Amino acid sequence: MAEPVGKRGRWSGGSGAGRGGRGGWGGRGRRPRAQRSPSRGTLDVVSVDLVTDSDEEILEVATARGAADEVEVEPPEPPGPVASRDNSNSDSEGEDRRPAGPPREPVRRRRRLVLDPGEAPLVPVYSGKVKSSLRLIPDDLSLLKLYPPGDEEEAELADSSGLYHEGSPSPGSPWKTKLRTKDKEEKKKTEFLDLDNSPLSPPSPRTKSRTHTRALKKLSEVNKRLQDLRSCLSPKPPQGQEQQGQEDEVVLVEGPTLPETPRLFPLKIRCRADLVRLPLRMSEPLQSVVDHMATHLGVSPSRILLLFGETELSPTATPRTLKLGVADIIDCVVLTSSPEATETSQQLQLRVQGKEKHQTLEVSLSRDSPLKTLMSHYEEAMGLSGRKLSFFFDGTKLSGRELPADLGMESGDLIEVWG
């Protein structure tokens, strides 16, 4: 049976020199490339499986067959029974080019793009505006060197002293704080590792002393700023007061004791149709009221009777003991003369007034008795025995030998005493 002539097309070179070439190898292998003509360059279709990281693709790569081809020839398959030529009536050209044996597994290779650093293209990440406003920091330079911890401490001091205004920007930004905290955490980790390696070694006191001194320094600076602020706000004292304050300090324990002015109580006295107001101290006895009303009415004080409601008041009582108020009114009654009073009409009621207001004494004396009796009685009553006293009546000094009848004395007359 004659072999069918293969179709010549665009890839006709891939079919070899014809069907008869296959019998020379005793199988379906291709003719060795050494037998091909070096002057004739042909194209063959080789199935190469390029596997990428994402998915698998099978690409057909056209390779030039020639004398300089570096692709090695696949080892020939073992000889086998030649397929019948009659069955290739309607097969495609692929069957002529490919053996009819079991399908070969495609060569799987991974696509790897290896470029030199000089061949890699440089693509700008940021635009021109971003680059102009962005200051990049070199990789070999630490961020904390650009921003020392002193700036953060000054910012904390400014916040604590309140010197920054509300509208002014804060001296520290959040990313600086994050970087510093990150650096501190790394330092703490290294310290913890050192402590784990040497558990018996106590912590160095240098860190404690540094923090203590730093805190003291901050406190002193804050106090200094507060003092400066206080000096600016407080008025400047006069120079004389400042020198006096530097020399000595005067502490006023208590203020000067002012003399207490007696509180006068306006006592209302009703006599017949008249209402008399007499200023009186709360601790003063009512005897002064009796004397004032006897003088006002022209009668003997023994005839004056004071009543509060229906209660007779004693001359020794005081407004405080009686609990009298401003609205209370005392009644004054003048007693009539009795027959006993006519019998004792020879007795004179003389008033003796000393230098002080409270040194007042009323003495009963007959008209025929010398005034020496009155003088001795007054000295004993006032406790002035042994003192030199002078008694005057109407401007005349009394010697004590005078009689009241000789001087024309009457009841209620006043004798003055001077020491």
Curated annotation (Swiss-Prot):
Residues 209-231 form a coiled coil. Residues 11-27 have a biased composition (Gly residues). There is a cross-link at residues 129, 131 (Glycyl lysine isopeptide (Lys-Gly) (interchain with G-Cter in SUMO2)). The modification Phosphoserine is found at residues 54, 84, 88, 90, 92, 127, 198, 201, 204, 220, 314, 369, 390. It is found in: Nucleus; Cytoplasm. Residues 1-131, 151-215 are annotated as: Disordered. It comes from the Eukaryota. Its main location: nucleus. Transmembrane segments: none annotated. InterPro entries: NFATC2-Int_DNA_Repair, Rad60/SUMO-like_dom, Ubiquitin-like_dom, Ubiquitin-like_domsf. One of its GO terms (cellular component) is nucleus. Keywords: Coiled coil, Cytoplasm, Isopeptide bond, Methylation, Nucleus, Phosphoprotein, Ubl conjugation. Residues 348-419 form the Ubiquitin-like domain. The modification Phosphothreonine is found at residues 316, 318. It holds the Pfam family Rad60-SLD. Residues 35-51 have a biased composition (Low complexity). Signal peptide: none annotated. Residues 180-192 have a biased composition (Basic and acidic residues). Methylation at the N-terminus by PRMT1 modulates interaction with the NFAT complex and results in augmented cytokine production. GO terms for biological process: positive regulation of transcription by RNA polymerase II; protein sumoylation. In T-helper 2 (Th2) cells, regulates the magnitude of NFAT-driven transcription of a specific subset of cytokine genes, including IL3, IL4, IL5 and IL13, but not IL2. Recruits PRMT1 to the IL4 promoter; this leads to enhancement of histone H4 'Arg-3'-methylation and facilitates subsequent histone acetylation at the IL4 locus, thus promotes robust cytokine expression. Down-regulates formation of poly-SUMO chains by UBE2I/UBC9. Interacts with NFATC2, TRAF1, TRAF2 and PRMT1. Interacts with UBE2I/UBC9. This is NFATC2-interacting protein. It comes from Homo sapiens (Human).
